[in-house]
């Protein structure tokens, strides 16, 4: 997360390094995380490749204007799992960010239910072993805050 200014700087820096950039709308101070105008702002002024949000209407708006829309899900119980699988069918996100990312059983269920939608494991992934476990469960990408994992490649994690 960060301020709007920090996010713009981080997106520019990451883009210049050839990285894909996604803005998690709930984590940016200075932007509404509920309005479609925020998605338009991210596309036009921030320059990110996509957004991350738990809000289905914002994912639909992102896709409409050419951004990737990543569905952010907290899967804390069986009901959240069932509802998340229903959302997968109804909004067709470009990816799914599952939290916590160490829930390999949940990652596997989503990976089996969505063979074409990338699964992003996120939250509580702090070691290379946890990162590798998430990938082996079916995650196709990771979103991590641990700096020691930022330079890891898939080859480093899957042997």
Question: What are the residue ranges of the model-derived segments?
Answer:
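Glycine-rich phosphate-binding active-site loops on the catalytic face of alpha/beta enzymes
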Residues: 1-3, 100-106, 123-158
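Structural motif
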Residues: 45-46, 65, 90-91, 137-138
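Alpha-helix capping/helix-boundary segments
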Residues: 57-58, 148
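Catalytic beta/alpha-barrel core
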Residues: 1-3, 22-31, 46-56, 70-79, ...
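Strongly charged, low-complexity linkers/loops
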Residues: 83-111
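Alpha-helix-loop-beta-strand connector modules within alpha/beta enzyme cores
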Residues: 7-23, 36, 44-46, 60-72, ...
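Short, acidic/polar
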Residues: 34-40, 78-89, 127-131
